[in-house]
Amino acid sequence: MKKPEKITSRTANFAKWYVDVITQADLMNYGPIKGTIYFKPLGYKIWENIVKIVNAYFVKQKIENVYFPLLIPQDFIEKEKKHIEGFAPELLTITKVGDKNLVENIYIRPTSELLFADYFKAEIAKNNILPIKLNQWSQVLRWEKTTNPFLRNTEFLWQEGHTIHASKVEADQFAKKIARFYKYFLENYLAIPVISGQKTEREKFAGAVNTYTVEAMMQNFRALQSATAHFLGQNFAKNFEIFYKNKENKSQIPFQTSWGLSTRLIGAIVMVHSDDNGLIFPPKIAPIQVDILEFFSKKNQEVKIFAKKIAKILKNAKISYKIDDTDQQIGYKINNSEVHGAPIRIEIGPNEVKNNQICLVRRDNHQKFFFNIDLLKEKCRKILEQIQADLFKKAKIRLLENTVFVNSINEFEHAVKNNKFVIAPFSESPEREQEIQEKTGATARCILPKNSFFALPQTGNSIFSGEKTNKFVLFAKSY
């Protein structure tokens, strides 16, 4: 078995560190085409855990799963030129099958609003029952100019939910509700604190009336748009001529939403929590919560028996585990466990067997605990809970300490140069946003709500025009 290679430090080269971690920790291999990856078992298990948790919420909300075609016909694209404009450079187009040119192009979905609109039209015409709440777990393809594993792939996995409602208020409120769930999920399961808010006109999803987003800070202080929910209004319903009959039997145009999160969350987990030794998983999302390392078990069968006893206790406690019973050296086993990020490792040798004792090590801070095996279930649960809380606390401190308020363009430029998240009074045009991006590299991440955990003043003077505004916008360099 090959010894784990040294991982580049975060301070030396953050981008190289990230790639080192995800490859050496066996999350993925590069695929044969730019922007594609092979999900290895550990990497895919993270996604399976995400799916399980998120799907349970969807079931409670009576959101049903479906699966729609990968291919979109040309006439759908023609109906929604404005919506597809934003995806035009990334749109994969099929023009030929075998040696025959197609009469009309076929497109590979970059997202599925067009398909859901078509489906909703048929279902409402048949049943006239609203709302309809659907979700699909699928893959989409976008020919990205710049790719980065998990964060920006040509092909990636995601969930995209779509609903259709009789009421404008109901639809918009539902989009906001999903955005709140995304915030809850990231903070409570992934231990990633986020800033939530509404996208600006320039940054909102093409075809949406409003886009609600959750933004996270990575360890290099770049923002990552982690999930979004869109209130689509009647934009798609009008173009697809979707109608329902109201209580007075009059034809009305309904309102839609769409919302999604993707495998970029795997990249977020790595970039927020991991260190120069490898992965660090929050326990609630960890594929393996406990690594059991056997030392000298080939010469001492009692070590192996003790490991199985530990495994049985963990299994009964519904704590996931893996036993390393290889004949590798102690240093290798510890290093390998560190790289792969299990929140806890338990080290077992002849001394632990002799004393009926557990040696438990936290992955995040390397703190060691020694206790009798009878306390394993209680101690393990408590320590896993503490790790989850500590990872969130550490990430939130980073977010708060590196988010600043500014009142002028000079302060803004200085803060961005120093890799800060910047909150500024801002009520300018999309052209001003573009100017800021070209000059500083920062983009508007979201308009902060009044109930943000940041103590926002009632009003401020917009940093360009000086006009009084009650709008405060978060800016940052981003992925």
Swiss-Prot record:
Where is it predominantly found? cytoplasm
The protein's GO terms of the molecular function aspect are: ATP binding; proline-tRNA ligase activity
Q: What is one Gene Ontology biological process annotated in the Swiss-Prot or TrEMBL record?
A: prolyl-tRNA aminoacylation
| CDD domains per UniProt | ProRS_core_arch_euk
Query: What enzyme class is recorded for this protein?
Result: ligase
May I have one GO cellular component term? Answer: aminoacyl-tRNA synthetase multienzyme complex
Q: Which reaction does it catalyse?
A: tRNA(Pro) + L-proline + ATP = L-prolyl-tRNA(Pro) + AMP + diphosphate
Intracellular or extracellular location(s) = Cytoplasm
E.C. code: 6.1.1.15
**Which Pfam families does the annotation name?**
HGTP_anticodon, ProRS-C_1, tRNA-synt_2b
Ordered alphabetically, the record's keywords are: Aminoacyl-tRNA synthetase, ATP-binding, Cytoplasm, Ligase, Nucleotide-binding, Protein biosynthesis
Which NCBIfam families does its entry note? Answer: proS_fam_I
Subunit (UniProt): Homodimer.
The entry's family comment says: Belongs to the class-II aminoacyl-tRNA synthetase family. ProS type 3 subfamily.
Q: What does this protein do?
A: Catalyzes the attachment of proline to tRNA(Pro) in a two-step reaction: proline is first activated by ATP to form Pro-AMP and then transferred to the acceptor end of tRNA(Pro).
Domain comment as written in the entry: Consists of three domains: the N-terminal catalytic domain, the anticodon-binding domain and the C-terminal extension.
**What name has this protein been given in UniProt?**
Proline--tRNA ligase
Organism of origin is: Mesomycoplasma hyopneumoniae (strain 232)
**Gene assigned in the entry:** proS
